[in-house]
Amino acid sequence: MNCKNMDTSYEIINYLTKDELDIDLSCMDKKERYKIWKRLPKCELHCHLDVCFSVDFFLNVIRKYNIQPNMSDEEIIDYYLFSKPGKSLDEFVEKALRLTDIYIDYTVVEDLAKHAVFNKYKEGVVLMEFRYSPSFMSFKHNLDKDLIHEAIVKGLNEAVALLEYKIQVGLLCTGDGGLSHERMKEAAEFCIKHKKDFVGYDHAGHEVDLKPFKDIFDNIREEGISLSVHAGEDVSIPNLNSLYTAINLLHVKRIGHGIRVSESQELIDLVKEKDILLEVCPISNVLLNNVKSMDTHPIRMLYDAGVKVSVNSDDPGMFLTNITDNYEELYTHLNFTLADFMKMNLWAVQKSFVDPDIKNKIISKYF
């Protein structure tokens, strides 16, 4: 696959306005509701660009580069992707590492970035923050991290221009150093080196208490880079220390996932006091077995308690889902309304790390 051969046509989306939020969804079938979810002007803050692709894109790369010549399409999907509930985040990480097979050259990386922007526009996203991990994308085929970054920025910018700026895109750098101070520092230095292209910094991978790395996060923040780390996602961890560290020591503006805030009234009060938004990824939480079912997802309780939350797809390529699937699940299982969703998306725009002028224009146009 090559960018020059990619379908860059697009349709104009007739977005919902504030005056159209009383649409009766109850009389619609699923197909009709999906048309509404698409028309809802959305801001997505938590999506890993590394795994933001359609099945067709993924299989095209696998076949073009002859990566798994002895597997059928079904076997490839089962081997690499995570379309049904698993046992844990660890199981997901194991599969995600296999995915690095596809980051075989810089053309694939650029194509992936461009493809992701077009897909998000087609889902009705007006403001999109992608994040990616330089180390994750580079290690399997020993690609140069700076050239990976160059390819991603080029792909994103070209796609936004081809879409005539009907979608705005920001980029976060993700560090995933685990408990290695050296790897964490290396990721932070990469982010600072390319800070003109990044709007924020994130830590992902296995959830850990980041207290030992406070100095690294302080350095990033002092460079004017906003912070959002994964915390309060993994229910197998016996404490909530990652959340307290993120809030009280790292001074994050947002938290990736953060659903375990619901387990503590003190944490609920704390995120409200500090005006921290939780980047909630509903389908991801269920598939990774951090929430037993969508009916019991804590986003409903958090929203009702006055905590700012947003709706996100996390790893849509891995999950064979997209952002509109998450809205459908929240409507079907937790009775969220269009007005609720509009409020969440306004919060997301307000808490986005992109330039304030971009945010103000989007708020004025859609909210």
Curated annotation (Swiss-Prot):
Keyword Transcription regulation: no
Pfam families (UniProt xref): A_deaminase
Family under the similarity heading: Belongs to the metallo-dependent hydrolases superfamily. Adenosine and AMP deaminases family.
Upper taxonomic lineage: Eukaryota, Sar, Alveolata, Apicomplexa, Aconoidasida
Co-factor note (free text): Binds 1 zinc ion per subunit.
PANTHER family xrefs: ADENOSINE DEAMINASE
Biological source species: Plasmodium falciparum (isolate 3D7)
GO MF, any single term: 5'-methylthioadenosine deaminase activity
This protein's record includes keyword Zinc: yes
Superkingdom field: Eukaryota
Effect of residue 174 to I: Slight increase in affinity for adenosine and severe reduction in affinity for 5'-methylthioadenosine
Pathway assigned to this chain's UniProt record: Purine metabolism; purine nucleoside salvage
Enzyme superclass (EC): hydrolase
Role, per record: Catalyzes the hydrolytic deamination of adenosine to produce inosine. Unlike mammalian adenosine deaminases, also catalyzes the deamination of 5'-methylthioadenosine (MTA), a by-product of polyamine biosynthesis, to produce 5'-methylthioinosine (MTI). Plays an essential role in the purine salvage pathway which allows the parasite to use host cell purines for the synthesis of nucleic acids.
Record GO biological process: adenosine catabolic process; hypoxanthine salvage; inosine biosynthetic process; negative regulation of adenosine receptor signaling pathway; purine ribonucleoside monophosphate biosynthetic process; purine ribonucleoside salvage
Effect in UniProt of substituting residue 174 to A: Slight decrease in affinity for adenosine and severe reduction in affinity for 5'-methylthioadenosine
Entry protein name: Adenosine deaminase
E.C. number: 3.5.4.4, 3.5.4.31
Residues that hold Zn(2+) according to the record: 46, 48, 230, 314
Activity regulation, free text: Inhibited by coformycin and methylthiocoformycin (MT-coformycin).
Gating helix loop as annotated region, ranges: 174-188
Residues annotated to bind a purine D-ribonucleoside: 48-50, 176, 205, 233, 257, 314
GO cellular-component term (any): cytosol
Keyword list, A-Z: Hydrolase, Metal-binding, Purine salvage, Zinc
Record site: Important for substrate specificity for S-methyl-5'-thioadenosine: 176
Cofactor(s) this protein requires: Zn(2+)
InterPro entries recorded: A/AMP_deam_AS, A_deaminase_dom, Ado/ade_deaminase, Metal_Hydrolase
UniProt xrefs under SUPFAM superfamilies: Metallo-dependent hydrolases (SSF51556)
